[in-house]
Each structure stands twice: as structure tokens, then as C-alpha cells.
Amino acid sequence: MAQSVSATRRISRLRRHTRLRKKLSGTAERPRLVVHRSARHIHVQLVNDLNGTTVAAASSIEADVRGVPGDKKARSVRVGQLIAERAKAAGIDTVVFDRGGYTYGGRIAALADAARENGLSF
């Protein structure tokens, strides 16, 4: 039985993410910046993989991001700014970028560029 196009794309993304996760791991000094993108929102977390904790998180669901005028890319930029601010507050300046199997472009690239411009290095 043939799969739908959306199922095939989801499975391909999960395979890409699995390949990435074999190579990426976050530590307390350099946590993993994990991105999840849905059709409407974008979520990002700083994860310490050694003890399985989330150091900081930001999402487009938050009230100050929902009020951003513009499209989803503008909201992604604001989420990138927020995660950089929260990382600085937690004493983190370098991260490992985990794009979650998504292609590096559009909202993912906008979030990463905004985080870099606001002080995160990866």
C-alpha cells in the first residue's frame, strides 16, 4: 500500500533527525539547541543530554511572541532572540544546533540567524 506524501515526508524527516542525533550531544557547558516546527508554531529548547534536563525554552505560543506583527518567519526571529536572551541568563554562550531533521532554510534559518545575532555561537 502506498503512503501519502505527508507520511513519506514525516518519515524522511525522522530518519534525518535520527542520523543527526547519532552525531550530536549536548553538555552542561554546550547544550543542544533543539528545534521543532509545526505548521503553525515553532518551539526551541536548550537540552543538556548528560542528565536529560532542559536548560531554557522558547516558543511562538508565548504571549510576547504571539503579538509580533508579520508572518511565521517574523515570529521565528523573535523566538530566536528569546532563546538567546534566556541562554545568556543561564550562563550559556555556545550551543550545538539540532535542526531536528528539518532543512536549513526558511523559519529554521531565521531562528538560527536571530539567535546568532543576539549572542549565541554555534
Curated annotation (Swiss-Prot):
Keywords: Ribonucleoprotein, Ribosomal protein, RNA-binding, rRNA-binding. CDD domains: Ribosomal_L18_L5e (cd00432). InterPro entries: Ribosomal_uL18_bac-type (IPR004389), Ribosomal_uL18_bac/euk (IPR005484). The keyword Lipid biosynthesis does not apply. One of its GO terms (biological process) is translation. It holds the Pfam family Ribosomal_L18p. One of its GO terms (cellular component) is cytosolic large ribosomal subunit. The keyword Ribonucleoprotein applies. One of its GO terms (molecular function) is 5S rRNA binding. Part of the 50S ribosomal subunit; part of the 5S rRNA/L5/L18/L25 subcomplex. Contacts the 5S and 23S rRNAs. Belongs to the universal ribosomal protein uL18 family. This is one of the proteins that bind and probably mediate the attachment of the 5S RNA into the large ribosomal subunit, where it forms part of the central protuberance. This is Large ribosomal subunit protein uL18. It comes from Mycobacterium tuberculosis (strain ATCC 25177 / H37Ra). The lineage of its organism: Bacteria, Bacillati, Actinomycetota, Actinomycetes, Mycobacteriales.
